[in-house]
Amino acid sequence: MKSAIRFSVMGLALALAVSGCGGTKSETSDGETVTVPAGTPPIWSLTGLPGPDNAQIQPIVVVKIENDPIVRPQTGLDRADLIFEELVEGGMTRFAVVYQSDLPDEVGPVRSVRHVDVAIAEPIADAFVFSGGARRTMKFVKRKIPTSISIVNEGAPGMYRKPGIPAPHDIFLKMSEMLDSIAPKNTLSTGFFVRPEVKPVVESASPSASSSASASPKPSSTALTGKPVTQVGVKFSSFSGPNWKWNAADKMWMRSEGIKPFLNKDGTQFGTNNLMIIEVREIDAGYKGSTGGYVPRTVLTGSGRAWVLSNGRATEVAWRKPFVNAQMELTDTSGNPFTMP
């Protein structure tokens, strides 16, 4: 049996850590009390891992981060609960990075928003951070993102240009400064997936692919029914095609760009416990890039196939996300709800 799989995809990668239920009462920073459904232990909304009593009212922050080779290693990727990788112009990819349980001091480089980021942020975000965007995309953001989500652009508290780095790669986010400037959270957060949700991280692909990073895996019988796999390649374009290799000792999928390890800021190789590769549609964004080239638009609504990679195995599932503001549902090939490991 072959132990390597290559998926040809066109534009989205997702990394996710999932949630569970809540229980107990917690206070927000402005003193308002939020009631968490009783009878459930405190967990982080995105990872489903044990957390403090107020875990589910901690803010969820979605940040758009650049992935041009010249900016690697980026700052803060290894601290994320969830990472989406998506195709942009020029055949390159960028990340929509989601934080809650582990907030880094600094994140970046921060770059511009795309339509697909709205479908990522709207169901879960309290703060949506990006440098700016094309006029058509910004109109979509303003139409779809509710006022309950704080939109943070260049010039907002916490956003700054780092000296010594050429524009446009120099915009970074100081997380605590930004969070201090937005309205306090007073509602319970939800995960990206409809319960039962993912426990570790996910990666998606299709005509668009996804990559993910998450907390330590708790194997599920569903995930373990998949085919043994030791390597996976996700081809976004002729320019971008990350590879993931299963490290059985660390129980992690380790990322490389070609044969070159994809590194964290501290020099270690980036890895995740679980990946989910999702098939999605890619269409023309309807505007040109800064150099006049084609700009792809990844469509993260509708339904399609996906592959969950966990514990050295790959399992085919189906995904469904009927609206931009809807959570994503996962089912197995028999139509039963799929539980991430």
Task: Give the role of each language-model region.
Residues 17-20:
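C-terminal motif of bacterial Sec signal peptides marking the signal peptidase cleavage site
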Residues 31-80, 89-341:
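A surface/extracellular/periplasmic glyco- and lipid-processing/surface-interacting theme
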Residues 22-25:
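Bacterial signal peptide processing site
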Residues 1-8:
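Bacterial N-terminal signal peptides that target proteins for export
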Residues 11-15:
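Alpha-helical transmembrane segments
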